[in-house]
């Protein structure tokens, strides 16, 4: 039905006037055919793809007169370039090539000097705004969703559809630090719907697309322990449990009723607001307790990654495109 008649929420046109019912059925069958073997993309593969710019030399200060903290990036998806604009005059300071099909959510280092750009085919590019030069790039996945930077600017998380992993990169060296297989508590291998930074919590938050779970991955060396199952303790400091994770990149599982496709947070990052795959409702998950605290109708296909919350007449409200 979607191929034949389109989906208004995505501005996708229908193809019923170009494809016969038999052709549409064949196309659906092809799309739904699972891969015979899921391709791997390991730490070694990522490291081998790493390509640092040989002509890059860091500068002690910006090489242009504009305010380096008032820069606008224009992501040109049609021809795979990014334009760097002076935020005051909108003069073009540089225009540089990017990998194919760049995602429109570049991430800046805390000092605003470096920007990291991800393409849908898994390439991550590091660009130095001060020198207006590319630092380097590597391929963190084969089909990637988005990226997030840690609160301290040390780590970059890459959410992947293929393979089903979360890749952690060093923002300093552009080297892979860890590749986490995204496997739900019930053993389901899952794609990552999206990953975002939760700065107050010193963690990455990601939603699993194929399993009803939210993950919190710590960027704090003192995080945890996080337990996957029940914890049994008869006395103080005598915990009996299996599968606990703690420290840097420790994972905490938060079960939800159904998989979430997109989400965002309230201003203090205590609550996550997510939407289900069918686009019929939203849920509010408290990240401290891990429980659902509210449910609200969200028909259509809201893009919660661009949502916002604020206080209005003493009530906390939200808006999302």
At which residue positions do the language-model features occur?
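Repeated scaffold domains used in trafficking and secretory/extracellular systems
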Residues: 52-62, 102-107, 143-151, 188-196, ...
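Short loop/turn segments that connect beta-strands within beta-propeller blades
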Residues: 87-89, 128-132, 170-174, 219-221, ...
């Amino acid at each position: 039905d979607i191929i034949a008649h389109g989906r208004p929420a995505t501005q996708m046109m229908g193809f019923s006037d170009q494809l016969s019912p038999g052709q549409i059925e064949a196309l659906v069958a092809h799309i739904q055919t699972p891969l015979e073997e899921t391709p791997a993309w390991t730490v070694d593969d990522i490291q081998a793809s790493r390509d640092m710019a040989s002509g890059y030399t860091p500068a002690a200060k910006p090489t242009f007169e504009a305010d380096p903290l008032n820069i606008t990036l224009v992501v040109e998806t049609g021809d795979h370039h990014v334009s760097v604009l002076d935020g005051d005059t909108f003069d073009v300071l540089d225009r540089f090539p990017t990998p194919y099909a760049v995602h429109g959510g570049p991430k800046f280092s805390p000092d605003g000097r470096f920007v990291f750009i991800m393409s849908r085919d898994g390439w991550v590019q590091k660009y130095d705004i001060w020198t207006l030069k590319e630092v380097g790039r590597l391929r963190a996945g084969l089909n990637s969703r988005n990226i997030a930077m840690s609160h301290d600017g040390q780590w970059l998380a890459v959410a992947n559809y293929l393979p089903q992993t979360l890749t952690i990169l060093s923002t300093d060296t552009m080297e892979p630090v860890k590749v986490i297989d995204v496997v739900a508590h019930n053993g389901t291998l899952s794609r990552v719907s999206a990953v975002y930074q939760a700065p107050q919590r010193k963690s990455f938050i990601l939603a699993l697309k194929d399993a009803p779970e939210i993950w919190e991955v710590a960027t704090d060396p003192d995080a945890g322990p996080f337990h996957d199952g029940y914890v049994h303790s008869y006395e103080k400091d005598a915990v009996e449990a299996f599968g606990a994770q703690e420290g840097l990149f420790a994972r905490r599982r938060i079960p939800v009723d159904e998989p979430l496709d997109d989400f965002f947070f309230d201003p203090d990052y205590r609550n996550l607001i997510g939407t289900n795959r069918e686009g019929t409702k939203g849920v509010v998950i408290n990240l401290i307790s891990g429980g659902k605290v509210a449910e609200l109708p969200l028909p259509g296909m809201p893009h919660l990654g661009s949502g916002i919350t604020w206080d209005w007449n003493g009530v906390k409200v939200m808006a999302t495109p």
